């Protein structure tokens, strides 16, 4: 084959693979990740049991279709040829067998690695092995790669993540690429053509607004979104998100013991309001029915998964009234509105629709969590709300 023709065919092939990648994550990705609950305590049996549980409890059919094995799945060193090796005790049948099982159950298979020389838990990282590792992932049937940012030395974040993106393209298997760079190099400004989602902050843990070293409660992470980018409302960090590329405020802590039921519901509601990827982080094998019902609520998930792809924003914050109001533009002229009680005790919250200046016109109001009509926007709405709980509404244009 002559050289110009060969180069042309390579370019066509690369373009075709890139198009397959661009067709992923048109709505925020949904799934489950092992880290928040299990950390290093993972194995083949756990992953299979999790998949089976997500079928039985309705999570798979609700859209949670990625199952992601986080850090600590590897052996401590590569083999003599430089290949990654799954831990033979945790995964005695290798990772292709795990991927095959997940695919047979209707899931997609996700895995973790790191842009540095070692992962955050001190296993082999991807730096210098990107193309080799991408081929391994493809051979195992990997559909999702979470790529962390530990032990990166002086590496440039944008170029490092682009290298892994190019390696995934070259391997030929469409992989949803999740950049876990913690927002240190403002990935929202450059990552839309590199990956499908990017972390905006450090790690979450199961707390409302606590801080534990590197980890933060979900409300603290939510508040941080407003210090990352100059601007307010729709001009804040949400302007960088949309179909195929999403701001990622980290995984869900819904159902974990550090949160009350109300705090879990508020956490879930507000992640849906900001069009966040919804990666469950609890032990779904032993989930209480009320958390199952929360995480599979179709009306709430529809807010997160709305095809318009707009990220919601804080429209009103009144600490003296213990209220924050978040709004999210939806398809077909509809809106979602979420009112959070920031008080340490139950409070009466009043939503005055005329104060939400971006929502113009008259709307019918539906209370999403109670699945009941809640009047219209010509009259304010008042209800008693538990500490750190929410009111969640969907607004539909009033019929003339």
PLM segments and residue spans:
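Glycan-recognition surfaces
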Residues: 132, 176-282
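Sec-dependent N-terminal signal peptides
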Residues: 4-13
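Catalytic cores of secreted or luminal carbohydrate-active enzymes
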Residues: 266-316
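Carbohydrate-binding surface patches
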Residues: 271-274, 279-281, 319-359
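Structural recognition of the beta-strand scaffold that forms the well-ordered cores
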Residues: 28-34, 63-70, 108-113, 143-148, ...
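Boundary at the C-terminal end of the N-terminal hydrophobic targeting segment
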Residues: 16-20
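Aromatic-lined carbohydrate-binding/catalytic grooves of carbohydrate-active enzymes
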Residues: 50, 54-154
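C-terminal beta-strand-rich structural cap/linker in extracellular carbohydrate-active enzymes
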Residues: 376-400
């Amino acid at each position: 084959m002559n050289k110009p023709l060969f180069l042309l065919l390579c370019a066509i092939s690369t373009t075709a693979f890139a198009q397959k990648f661009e067709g992923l994550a048109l709505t925020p990705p949904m799934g489950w990740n092992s880290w928040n609950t299990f950390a290093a305590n993972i194995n083949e049996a756990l992953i299979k049991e999790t998949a089976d549980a997500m079928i039985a409890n309705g999570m798979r059919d609700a859209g949670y279709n990625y199952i992601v094995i986080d850090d600590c799945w590897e052996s401590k060193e590569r083999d003599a040829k430089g290949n990654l090796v799954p831990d033979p005790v945790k995964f005695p049948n290798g990772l292709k067998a795990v991927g095959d099982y997940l695919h047979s159950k209707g899931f997609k298979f996700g895995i973790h690695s790191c842009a540095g020389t070692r992962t955050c838990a001190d296993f082999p990282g991807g730096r210098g092995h990107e193309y080799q590792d991408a081929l391994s992932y493809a051979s195992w049937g990997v559909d999702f790669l979470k790529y962390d940012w530990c032990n990166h030395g002086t590496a440039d974040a944008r170029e490092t993540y682009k290298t892994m993106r190019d390696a995934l393209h070259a391997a030929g298997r469409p992989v949803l690429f999740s950049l876990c760079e913690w927002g240190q190099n403002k990935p929202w400004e450059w990552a839309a053509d590199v990956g499908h989602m990017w972390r905006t902050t450090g790690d979450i843990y199961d707390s409302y607004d606590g801080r534990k070293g590197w980890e933060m409660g979900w409300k603290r992470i939510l508040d941080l979104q407003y210090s990352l980018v100059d601007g307010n409302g729709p001009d804040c960090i949400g302007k960088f998100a949309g179909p195929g590329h999403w701001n990622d405020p980290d995984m869900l802590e819904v159902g974990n013991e550090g949160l009350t039921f109300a705090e879990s519901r508020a956490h879930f509601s507000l992640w849906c309001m900001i069009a966040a990827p919804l990666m469950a982080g609890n032990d779904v094998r032993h989930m209480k029915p009320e958390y199952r019902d929360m995480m599979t609520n179709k009306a709430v998930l529809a807010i997160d998964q709305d095809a318009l792809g707009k990220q919601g924003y804080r429209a009103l914050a009144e600490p003296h009234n213990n209220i924050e109001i978040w709004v999210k533009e939806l398809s077909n002229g509809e809106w979602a509105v979420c009112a959070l009680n920031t008080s340490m005790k139950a409070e009466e919250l009043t939503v005055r629709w005329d104060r939400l200046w971006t929502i113009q016109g008259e709307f019918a109001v539906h209370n999403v969590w109670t699945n009941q009509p809640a009047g219209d926007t010509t009259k304010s709405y008042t209800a008693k709300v538990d500490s750190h709980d929410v009111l969640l509404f969907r607004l539909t244009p009033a019929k003339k």
